[in-house]
Amino acid sequence: IGSGLVGSEMCIRDRYRNLAVEEYLLLHCEDKECILYLWQNQNTVVIGRNQNAWKECRTTKLEEEGGHLARRLSGGGAVYHDLGNMNFTFLINKEEYDLDRQLQVIIGAMEILGLKAEKSGRNDILIDGKKFSGNAFYEQEKHCYHHGTIMVGVNMETLSRYLTVSKDKLKAKGVDSVKSRVTNL
């Protein structure tokens, strides 16, 4: 399988451009190519394809504080991005798609850093029982992608201020708040 690393000499932190680049790469990925796209957004809540922004996010507060709201192609929950968060996207054709192998890249990177990470459920990667990486997926006719977050130094106060999570979901996870469920590396 061929591989590629897409980047820029200047880090682009525009949420709309980053999501557009992700879609462009998906549409132009060669058949035997695996692309790893690394990106960051600043002060942004990104919601899944079918989410209601007003149920997932305090949109008024986000807007008042100069934040931005964006919608991605994939499903999954709302996430908060700031410069303490690194985003990754694996783009590949459907025949070569291997979620476990892709997750192992992230888990292996954590091992190199001396951290024991583990997959939990379909779309989380945990350290010490707390999520530092949430993942989501999207496919079209020939290609698909798997993207996720890596929380390195996310502002947890801001994350908690903007994101709203149903009490039922928190109860199912056995935690009292979003902040108590997630962690920075």
Model-derived features: positions:
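Single conserved hydrophobic/aromatic residue that forms the stacking wall/gate
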Residues: I1-G7, I12
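Active-site cofactor/substrate anionic-group-binding motifs, chiefly glycine-
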Residues: W54-G77
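Short, conserved charged micro-motifs
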Residues: K55-C57, E96-R101, T158
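Residues forming anionic-ligand binding surfaces in small-molecule and nucleic-acid pockets
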Residues: L73-L91, D168-L185
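Contiguous, small/hydrophobic- and glycine-enriched helical/loop subdomains that border
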Residues: N85-R122
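Beta-rich nucleic-acid/ligand-interaction surfaces
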Residues: K119-A136
